[in-house]
Regions:
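Long, hydrophobic N-terminal alpha-helical segment
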Residues: 1-41, 63
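Vicinal oxygen chelate
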Residues: 12-20, 34, 44-47, 54, 60, 72-142
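Short, charged/polar surface micro-motifs in flexible loops or helix N-caps
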Residues: 49-53, 60-62, 87
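Conserved secondary-structure micro-motifs at functional edges
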Residues: 29, 55-69
Length: 142
């Protein structure tokens, strides 16, 4: 079901300023920003080899990330993402065990073209969890 950690997501009030700080202070390379229209966020990633740091800022005032910044004006950790082989079967297994999946429960597609779903924080020790489908070239879980 779960094959590893994909990324940790940090909401920031200013994506460009956050990218500069991580570059200047830690020497990290931040990828090009992309917009996820469906979620209303602008994203940029720091590749760390076996996982990523995802930086997010609101792209719309009505996005969940904008609401997060209202409660946390300086930003902070928003969620972490677990890699799974098949989002749909993982969601089904979790629901069968009583977990709540956010939204309509159907997988969405992220800016990388991967299928994703979110598990309610009450069902993972208070943390919002994203499930992201990771497959190798042969279509198997990686």
């Amino acid at each position: 079901m779960i094959s590893g950690l994909s990324h940790v997501s940090i909401v920031v009030p200013d994506l460009a300023a956050a990218a500069r700080r991580l570059r200047d202070m830690y020497g990290l390379v931040i990828g090009e920003a992309k917009v996820n229209e469906e979620q209303g966020v602008r994203l940029a990633y720091v590749e760390l080899g076996n996982a990523r740091i995802e930086l997010m800022e609101p792209a719309r005032v009505d996005s969940p990330v904008a609401k997060f910044l209202e409660r946390n004006p300086n930003g902070g950790i928003h969620h972490f993402c677990l890699a799974v082989g098949d989002v749909e079967s993982t969601v089904t297994q979790l629901r069968d065990k009583g977990a709540r999946v956010l939204g309509d429960g159907k997988a969405q597609v992220n800016v990388h073209g991967a299928r994703i779903a979110f598990v309610h924080p009450k069902d993972f020790l208070g943390a919002l969890v994203e499930l992201e489908e990771h497959q190798d070239e042969e279509g198997g879980a990686r």
